[in-house]
């Protein structure tokens, strides 16, 4: 209704993105009722936060199904349309929980890091058809974030900071990545209130070699010590983004 009130056209679909057939129906509905499809924003998500040794199979499956499988399902359905028209843009939602890390979110982190890999693969596979794919790692208060359990004062303070960051701050970046004039593809952007970050992607940072090869002993005696200065600490997202939102 809000879209229509501002002069746009909108249709609603209440099916689950975790269902491959339902995702295809969503794409078909968009094409039939709106006259085409140019942009896909994979935004569906749920949380089932729990410390790893207490995580159930259902905790794992439900989060992976909505986030990672859901992103695949909708993207795969749209890929056929994009390929035929030789244009289109995907914007996927990843998270610093996967890119950096967080407590009690093994399911969510795995799904979100998987989405970053999915987006890069789509960018590589579909670039020949003038189709682009990027990720946004959003910092924003939403209904999903509102389900995070508050266990102590530190978590409560973090949640209060999150409440100051609205989804309206994310939308301009999603739109900018989707317009025809944009040539950006295969990238990951963090959006935190009025800040935009280009997030790094995995590349080698140090290397060692040994002409005669390695044994477990020489790995421990030589390889590990020579690379140890470059090890990443067990940071959480809030350790890296430790300042108040700007």
Where are these regions (language model features)?
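A glycine-rich helix->loop->beta "capping" turn
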Residues: 6-9, 29-42, 48, 87, ...
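Substrate-binding pocket helix/loop in short-chain dehydrogenase/reductase
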Residues: 51-52, 59-64
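C-terminal helical subdomain
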Residues: 156-246
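The beta1-alpha1 cofactor-binding region of Rossmann-like NAD(H)/NADP(H)-dependent oxidoreductases
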Residues: 14-25, 57
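Active-site helix of classical SDR
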Residues: 75, 111, 119
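Residue(s) in the substrate-gating loop at a strand-loop-helix junction
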Residues: 95
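Active-site-adjacent segment of SDR/Rossmann-fold oxidoreductases
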Residues: 81-84, 100, 116, 121-131, ...
């Amino acid at each position: 209704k809000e879209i229509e009130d501002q002069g746009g056209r909108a249709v609603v679909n209440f099916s689950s993105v975790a269902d491959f057939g339902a995702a295809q129906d969503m794409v078909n509905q968009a094409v039939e009722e709106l006259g085409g499809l140019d942009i896909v924003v994979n935004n569906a998500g749920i949380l089932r936060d729990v410390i790893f040794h207490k995580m159930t199979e259902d905790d794992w499956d439900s989060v992976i199904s909505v986030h990672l499988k859901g992103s695949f399902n909708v993207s795969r359905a749209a890929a056929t349309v994009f390929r035929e028209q030789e244009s289109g843009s995907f914007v996927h939602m990843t998270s610093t929980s996967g890119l950096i890390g967080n407590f009690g979110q093994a399911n969510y982190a795995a799904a979100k890091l998987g989405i970053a890999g999915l987006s890069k693969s789509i960018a590589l596979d579909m670039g020949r058809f003038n189709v682009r794919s990027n990720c946004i790692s959003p910092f924003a208060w939403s209904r999903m974030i509102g389900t995070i359990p508050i266990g102590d004062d530190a978590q409560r303070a973090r949640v209060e900071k999150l409440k100051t960051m609205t989804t309206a701050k994310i939308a301009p970046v999603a739109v900018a990545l989707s317009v025809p004039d944009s040539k950006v593809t295969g990238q990951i952007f963090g959006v935190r209130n009025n800040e935009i970050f280009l997030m790094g992607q995995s590349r080698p940072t140090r290397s060692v070699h040994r002409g005669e090869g390695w044994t477990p002993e020489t790995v421990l005696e030589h390889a590990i010590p020579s690379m140890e200065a470059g090890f990443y600490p067990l940071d959480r997202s809030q350790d890296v983004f430790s300042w108040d939102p700007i």
